[in-house]
């Protein structure tokens, strides 16, 4: 499928990317998919969505900041899959949590701190490369994902037909906000 351009000058992007016949890839994010605990949180998420680069799944990293969706947790990077070869079925837990990334020129990266460890979140130094990258989940100001639930599924696929046969959503918020006297309409 066609892939977006717009990488930094030192990088290369292919004009197309391969896709699988059986895909758990989510539809592209839209501004109306932005969500928040409060209307103000949702507004800030929409502002951030429009501030960051995002042209779909293969949007290249940028100095401005980029939405990575599906993010670093997957679709199946963390949840993995199980296959029953006799019945030709596959079960997995696709995760659809958006991340953000922002390239950092080598000259702007602070010296490595003692005991500093690599992580899925924060600064990835990319030693030897001209840029590091700051990565993390795409969260609102209240540290809740900016995209509306669900953030993933438990799913099964029929490998003989290449079709998703069953999905159950994960990442829902119950209709209460804990001990706060505020009702949350997302279920």
Descriptions of predicted regions:
Residues 1-187:
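Noncatalytic, solvent-exposed loop/strand surfaces
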